[in-house]
Amino acid sequence: MADWQEITGGITAPKGYRAAGITAGLKPSGLPDLALIVSDVEAIASGVFTTSQVKAACVDYCRQRLQAKQSARAILCNAGQANAATGSQGIKDAEESAELLAKELNISPELILLASTGVIGQRIKMDALRNGIPKLIASLTDTGSDAAAGAIITTDLVTKSIALETTIGDRPVRIGGIAKGSGMIHPNMATMLAFVTCDAAVSSHLWQQMLTRAADRSFNSITVDGDTSTNDSLIALANGQSRTPAITEVGAESEKLEAMLTAVCQHLAKAIARDGEGATCLIEVQVTGAHDEQAARQIAKTIAGSSLVKSAIFGRDPNWGRIAAAAGRAGVPFEQENLQIQLGDFLLLDNGQPLPFDRAAASAYLKQAATGAYLQQDTVLISVKVGNGHGTGKAWGCDLSYDYVKINAEYTT
C-alpha cells in the first residue's frame, strides 16, 4: 500500500510555491499560452531533457544553467512557438525572456529556467511575451496550478496535474506536478513538458539522481507515436519549506521521497499516454522474468510502441501474435518457450504455446476500455513473462486510431 495520499492543489500544493497561466497572444487561437511557477525561496533544481540532436533554445539554456547552479526560483513556459531550430536569434530570445522575468521578479536571471512548446522553427513572439510577463506576475497565486497547467498545453485534450502528501519525520511533505503532451511522445530523456514542485529539503545530487530514476520509470517508459521532441523537458524544484530535516544521503527517508516522486511522474506520464492524439484508451504493458529492470522496460516499451499492437487494440482485436512479434524484436534475448502473454484476465499464450480463449469476450474487454472512466477503467493491460529472471518493468502507450493521422495531417509541427 502506498505510503502517501492524493491531495488537491497540483504544483501549488507544496508549501512556498505560486503559479499562474494567462493568455499573452502567443497562440493564434487566443487560448492561454504563458505559464509561470515561482518558489518563494531559492530551491534545489534538477532537470532531464530531450536526447534529440536538434534541441530547442530553452533546452540548451536550462542545461547550461543547471550545470552552473543547481538551484532556481522560477520556471517560465510559453506555448505556441517551440523556439527550436531558430538559430542564434532563438538563443537570444530565450536569454531575453529570462532577463525580462528576472527584472520583474527582482531576482538574478541565473535563477530562471525556461521551457517552450509549439511549432518547430518558429521563434517566440517576443512582443507578446514582453507585454505578457507583468500580467503573468500579477496573476501569481498559491492556487494557480490549474491556470498554469492550462497555459502549457497545445494539442492536449485535457490538462494533467497531481499532488501527493506523505510524512517525513513528523511533518507533512508534498510533491505536485503538471505536464503537457499528446503527440511526439517517445521521450528519451513528446512535445513532453513536466514540472514538479516539492517542499522537502534534499541535497542537489540526491534530487538529480531521484529525478533521473523517476524519469526512466515514467516519462521514458511512455510512447504515443515514436517521435521524440526537440523540447522534451522535466524540471523539478525542492525548496525545503516543509521544514523537515535535510535529506543528504540514501536511506529510508530518501527512498520514501523518491517513491512518491516516481508516483507523481508515473501519474503524469500515464495521463500523457492516455491523451495521445486520437487515442481511445491507455495501454499498460507489464513485463516480468527479464534479466534486469532495463531489459524488462525495453521489451515493454517496444510492445507499447508497436503500431501493429496499437492498431489491433483500436480495432478491438485480441491479436496476441503482434504482441509476441514486438517482444521478439525488442533486442532483449529470451527463450521463446518461456514466453507467456496475457490480455487483461485472458491467458493467450503460455510456455510458448497458444491457448484456447474466448475471442469475443477478449474483444469485449478491449471495447470496454474505450468507454471506461478516465485513467481507471480505460486501461488495456498486457502482461508478458519472458523467463524466470528478477527484472520487471512497465511501459505505457495508447491505441492508434484514424484520428491520429487526421490531427497530424492538419497540424503544422
From Swiss-Prot:
Subunit structure: Heterotetramer of two alpha and two beta chains.
Residues of the site described as Involved in the stabilization of negative charge on the oxyanion by the formation of the oxyanion hole: 117-118
Binding site for substrate: 154, 180, 191, 277, 408, 413
Role this protein plays: Catalyzes two activities which are involved in the cyclic version of arginine biosynthesis: the synthesis of N-acetylglutamate from glutamate and acetyl-CoA as the acetyl donor, and of ornithine by transacetylation between N(2)-acetylornithine and glutamate.
The encoding gene: argJ1
Catalysed reaction equations from the record: N(2)-acetyl-L-ornithine + L-glutamate = N-acetyl-L-glutamate + L-ornithine; L-glutamate + acetyl-CoA = N-acetyl-L-glutamate + CoA + H(+)
Family of this protein: Belongs to the ArgJ family.
Protein location: Cytoplasm
EC category: transferase
GO cellular component annotations of the record: cytoplasm
Site description Cleavage, residues in chain: 190-191
Protein name: Arginine biosynthesis bifunctional protein ArgJ 1
Main location: cytoplasm
